[in-house]
């Protein structure tokens, strides 16, 4: 676990030539972000892991028509793999165990789960409530809606006013809302300083990955740092993103083998 990804991951990296992420932490503007891999907890087989690796390869490829068509096929496979009921059950059980025993969550209990898709976000949500029926105010799904959504989805997702209300509650440290399940929303430009832990169940890379994990690096009271918990093998993509988007951090962490540095 306690492997520091950077000495602070934040929006400051946009000005990387002047103010890199290492400097941000040294100046007290952000907190360190730590990485923990729990991919092994899902007990995914080799074929599944290879499919996930292909997803990262496609992200790195040029978006020509052939790649786009291949991506559609791989996305369909990823949905089936990551949305498997047994895998979701294992995932949620492990997330809850980690959440309830992680000292970083003792401060305010704010955590975010990044789901691969809207369907998977709903599965995670319902599984959490099956385990903890009394958590209806503690956990929420925050994602876009569609007029094709089933009625039961609409009741959970709500309208724009409902999403705005959820945002206010999540930023309020005294609110009972502690866990937000997201897909794309809230991963950029949404700051909750008390947010301590992000559970990642979605392949991400580059700019999008850096923006996402920056959600947990804000300064708050006695918060020592943010924690990114990985369930889909983002380590290599994370290392590459750090090399691409930082200056001094590239020197500090560019040669680090993230996969070996973390503890399981």
What are these regions (language model features)?
Residues 133-134, 215-225:
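Arginine/glycine-rich "motif VI" loop of SF2 helicases in the C-terminal RecA-like domain
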Residues 15-108:
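Conserved interdomain linker/interface between the two RecA-like ATPase lobes of SF2 helicase motors
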Residues 1, 31-33, 109-112, 121, ...:
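Beta-sheet entry/capping signal
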Residues 182, 186-203, 208-211, 226-230:
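A short beta-strand element within the Helicase C-terminal
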Residues 26, 39-43, 118-120, 146-148, ...:
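Conserved nucleotide-binding/hydrolysis micro-motifs of P-loop NTPases
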Residues 72-182:
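Conserved C-terminal RecA-like helicase domain
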Residues 2-13:
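Single conserved hydrophobic/aromatic residue that forms the stacking wall/gate
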Residues 220-264:
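Long, hydrophobic alpha-helical segments
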């Amino acid at each position: 676990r306690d492997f520091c990804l950077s000495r602070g991951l934040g929006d400051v990296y946009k000005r990387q030539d002047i103010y890199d992420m290492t400097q941000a932490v040294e100046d007290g503007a952000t907190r360190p972000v730590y990485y923990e891999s729990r991919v092994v907890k899902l007990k995914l087989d080799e074929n599944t892991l290879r499919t996930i690796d292909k997803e990262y390869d496609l992200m790195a490829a040029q978006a020509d028509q052939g790649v786009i068509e291949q991506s559609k096929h791989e996305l369909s496979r990823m949905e089936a793999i990551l949305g498997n009921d047994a895998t979701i059950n294992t995932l949620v059980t492990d997330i809850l165990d980690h959440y309830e025993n992680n000292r970083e969550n003792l401060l305010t209990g704010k955590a975010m789960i990044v789901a691969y898709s809207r369907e998977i976000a709903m599965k995670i949500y319902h599984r959490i409530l099956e385990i903890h029926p009394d958590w209806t105010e503690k956990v929420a799904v925050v994602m876009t809606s569609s007029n094709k959504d089933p009625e039961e989805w609409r009741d959970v997702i709500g309208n724009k006013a409902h999403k705005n209300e959820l945002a206010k509650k999540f930023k309020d440290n005294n609110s009972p809302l502690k866990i937000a399940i997201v897909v794309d929303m809230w991963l950029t430009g949404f700051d909750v300083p008390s947010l301590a832990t992000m559970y990642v169940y979605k392949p991400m890379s580059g700019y999008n990955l850096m923006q996402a994990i920056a959600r947990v690096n804000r300064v708050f009271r006695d918060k020592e740092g943010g924690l990114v918990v990985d369930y889909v093998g983002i380590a290599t993509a994370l290392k590459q993103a750090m090399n691409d988007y930082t200056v001094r951090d590239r020197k500090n962490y560019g040669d680090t083998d993230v996969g070996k540095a973390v503890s399981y």
